[in-house]
């Protein structure tokens, strides 16, 4: 093969989505070291959760792969925050770890438009004609019009087990030794980040009777609407740390490479190691931990919330201080990994390098944390790389479109001083960009971008035509002088209750009934959110000159610190600062209003 439209470097979650998206346009090469590691879940065996499931639903709506893989290998599904409103409800799918990777490999390796190329990227060279050559360590020069670098935690990766380190991108896998150099020489500022993973414990050595069992939802949910047949087969469990856990950690902090100063990389604020939790939250006498199976008939469980870089002999002692783990045997020890990332403010909103036109980056190389964030970036980078290689018009997914737009906007305009994790609190107007309406919002966009087929778009259009027919049926029929939608707006009424009164509805699937119910019950709130969205365009131009940020108690601690440091001159500038969230902007607007009223009186 003399060349490709796009070469994707890396077979993790970002690389998979990039190759999948780019292959919808033209032929793609996926450059990987070991095919057996493609699609691997190196950390938790699950997809979704608050802020993250919304990304997966949006990736699915845009023709992506992750939601499909998660559903096909699901062993446990749960809607989190189910008792709260739809704006913050999130699906979490527990997966069969090995099956997820195997299914990903089946899909990618079986795709006629994706060529699998084995090797390690050593350099990126311009071909002098607007394209690129990916030079491998064995001297091959692979030609492409565009390149997506999705190197994960592998660029100059180092793993840490206590004070001992190894050159690895993750456990047992060699790092990418040379790829940082061409990025740095082009002008990219490289930073060192750190993340970690918990230990895996032999399941037959755990006393599950001492743990709190968390069953799967009886009616399984999926990202595609079709979770696999095993989606309710396995529970998860909950345990917690003890005072003895905390005592051991405090007494052995000198064994931690982070606290000893060996690790330079910045770790994730919202997913701290167990050492960090004990030190930063010393006033807590316990920390909750979740025990997740690696599969239905697994020999291992994953100890969510217990990531660590302490040495193996200490991990053995620590795990045995947990209820139910008194006889625990660790099969794979926890470790930390330190790696290079680019400064994401040096990218465009399509994740293209500002210094290397035609080179895109996606996933943890951009300073993010998590499978879902990586997949979302991979889809965008793969799509944009393919469109660029074909000379198609550049398309930008804006902040207002949903969680994916917020992710891109935050990375490019705010950047991050630590691994970035998507959360619902980062997103303005969450009621407008829920997980349940991702297809309605984004599938038409996916069709325009070339990511979604006419047939897929037609199915979504038909779905919401049926929802609209249901709404019209509610509005048309009256019981006891009130229309069906008026009855449904009552807090104590669900759609089934309205039907029990005698209101007749067309046949609707479960997800269509849910969409109809949300549309009716939250109509007033949704209209208000739309009006607020319009008014905020004006509010963002307001001046912050002379505002004493340190004196505004209602701001979050992080926002107060960042605002005082950066001294933004307008609300829009404040909103672009890493660590300043939508709630903080609301606090600033209230403060400005109070100042104006005070001056006027």
UniProtKB/Swiss-Prot annotation:
Organism placement in taxonomy: Bacteria, Thermotogati, Deinococcota, Deinococci, Deinococcales
Residue stretches spanning the membrane: none
Residues the entry annotates as binding NAD(+): 267-281
Annotated InterPro entries: FAD/NAD-bd_sf, GIDA_C_N, MnmG, MnmG-rel, MnmG-rel_CS, MnmG_C, MnmG_C_subdom, MnmG_C_subdom_sf
Similarity section: Belongs to the MnmG family.
Gene name for this UniProt entry: mnmG
Composition bias type Polar residues, residue spans: 233-242
A single GO cellular-component term on record: cytosol
Domain of life: Bacteria
Keywords on record: Cytoplasm, FAD, Flavoprotein, NAD, tRNA processing
UniProt subcellular location: Cytoplasm
Positions of region (Disordered): 216-242
Residues that hold FAD according to the record: 10-15
Pfam families: GIDA, GIDA_C_1st, SAM_GIDA_C
GO biological process, one term: tRNA methylation
GO molecular function: flavin adenine dinucleotide binding
UniProt function note: NAD-binding protein involved in the addition of a carboxymethylaminomethyl (cmnm) group at the wobble position (U34) of certain tRNAs, forming tRNA-cmnm(5)s(2)U34.
Gene source species: Deinococcus deserti (strain DSM 17065 / CIP 109153 / LMG 22923 / VCD115)
Record has Secreted as a keyword: no
Cofactor field: FAD
Subunit structure: Homodimer. Heterotetramer of two MnmE and two MnmG subunits.
Record's protein name: tRNA uridine 5-carboxymethylaminomethyl modification enzyme MnmG
């Amino acid at each position: 093969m003399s060349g490709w439209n796009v070469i994707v470097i890396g077979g993790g979650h970002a690389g998979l989505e990039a190759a999948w998206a780019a292959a919808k346009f033209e032929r793609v090469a996926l450059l990987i070291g070991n095919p057996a590691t493609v699609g691997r879940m190196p950390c938790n065996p699950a997809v979704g959760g608050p802020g993250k499931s919304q990304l997966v639903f949006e990736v699915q709506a845009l023709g992506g792969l992750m939601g499909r893989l998660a559903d096909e290998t699901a062993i446990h599904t749960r809607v989190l925050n189910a008792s709260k409103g739809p704006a913050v409800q999130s699906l979490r799918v527990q997966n069969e770890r090995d099956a997820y990777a195997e299914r990903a490999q089946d899909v990618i390796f079986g795709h006629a438009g994706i060529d699998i190329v084995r090797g390690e990227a050593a350099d990126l060279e311009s071909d002098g004609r607007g394209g690129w050559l990916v030079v491998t360590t064995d001297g091959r020069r692979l030609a492409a019009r565009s390149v997506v670098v999705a190197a994960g935690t592998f660029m100059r990766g180092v793993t840490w087990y206590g004070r001992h380190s190894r050159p690895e991108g993750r456990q047992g896998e060699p790092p990418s030794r040379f790829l940082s150099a061409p990025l740095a020489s082009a002008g990219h500022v490289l930073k060192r980040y750190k993340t970690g993973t918990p230990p895996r414990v032999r399941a037959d050595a755990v006393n599950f009777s001492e743990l709190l069992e968390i069953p799967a939802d009886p009616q399984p949910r999926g990202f595609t609407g079709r979770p696999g047949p095993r989606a309710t087969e396995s529970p998860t469990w909950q345990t917690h740390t003890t005072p003895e856990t905390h005592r051991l950690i405090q007494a052995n902090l000198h064994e931690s490479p982070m606290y000893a100063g060996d690790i330079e990389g910045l770790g994730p604020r919202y997913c701290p190691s167990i050492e960090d939790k004990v030190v930063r939250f010393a006033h807590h006498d316990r920390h909750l931990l979740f025990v997740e199976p690696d599969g239905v008939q697994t020999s291992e469980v994953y100890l969510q919330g217990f990531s660590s870089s302490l040495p193996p002999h200490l991990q053995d002692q620590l795990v045995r201080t947990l209820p139910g783990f008194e006889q625990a045997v660790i099969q794979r020890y926890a470790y930390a990994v330190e790696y290079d990332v680019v400064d994401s403010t040096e990218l465009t909103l399509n994740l293209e390098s500002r210094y290397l036109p035609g080179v895109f980056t996606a996933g943890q190389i951009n300073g993010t944390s998590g499978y879902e964030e990586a997949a979302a970036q991979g889809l965008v980078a793969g799509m944009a790389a393919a469109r660029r290689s074909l000379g198609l018009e550049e398309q930008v997914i804006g902040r207002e479109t949903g969680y994916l737009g917020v992710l891109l906007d935050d990375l490019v305009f705010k950047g991050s001083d630590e691994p970035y994790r998507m959360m619902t609190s980062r997103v303005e107007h969450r009621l407008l960009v829920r997980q349940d309406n991702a297809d309605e919002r984004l599938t038409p966009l996916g069709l325009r971008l070339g990511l979604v087929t006419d047939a897929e778009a037609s199915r979504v259009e038909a779905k919401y035509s049926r929802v609209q027919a249901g709404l019209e049926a509610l509005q048309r029929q009256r019981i006891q002088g009130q229309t069906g939608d008026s009855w449904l707006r009552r807090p104590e009424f669900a759609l089934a209750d309205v039907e029990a009164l005698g209101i007749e509805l067309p046949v609707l699937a479960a997800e269509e009934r849910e969409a109809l119910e949300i549309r009716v019950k939250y109509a007033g709130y949704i209209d208000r959110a739309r009006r607020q969205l319009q008014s905020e365009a004006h509010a963002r131009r307001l001046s912050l000159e002379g505002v004493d940020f340190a004196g505004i108690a209602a701001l979050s601690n992080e926002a107060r610190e960042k605002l005082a440091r950066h001294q933004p001159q307008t609300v829009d500038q404040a909103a672009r600062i890493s660590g300043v969230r939508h709630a903080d902007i609301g606090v600033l607007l209230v403060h400005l209003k109070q100042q104006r009223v005070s001056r006027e009186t």
